[in-house]
UniProtKB/Swiss-Prot annotation:
Disulfide bonds: C51-C63, C55-C72, C62-C76
Pfam families associated with the record: Conotoxin
Top-level taxonomic group: Eukaryota
InterPro entries per the UniProt record, alphabetical: Conotoxin
Note on domains (UniProt): The presence of a 'disulfide through disulfide knot' structurally defines this protein as a knottin. The cysteine framework is VI/VII (C-C-CC-C-C).
One term of GO molecular function: ion channel inhibitor activity
Protein name in UniProt: Conotoxin TsMSGL-11
Propeptide intervals in chain numbering: 25-44
UniProt note on tissues of expression: Expressed by the venom duct.
Keyword ATP-binding (UniProt): no
Cell compartments where the protein resides: Secreted
Amino acid sequence: MSGLGIMVLTLLLLVFMATSHQDAGEKQATQRDAINVRRRRSITRRVDEECNEYCDDRNKECCGRTNGHPRCANVCFG
């Protein structure tokens, strides 16, 4: 194989290695973001369930929380 052929193969190998490292970083960041989203959803869901149970006992709708306490109303605005 000529010197030019070896140089071309080496260049292709270097380009492949560089792009594979970039993809790994993006994949890792995507997985980390997905874990954070799952944690937020589980926390939000638990809070919503508590609020819904509290307001259902009073025959009202849960409109979220104010200062850590469930906010109940007949109709939620906003």
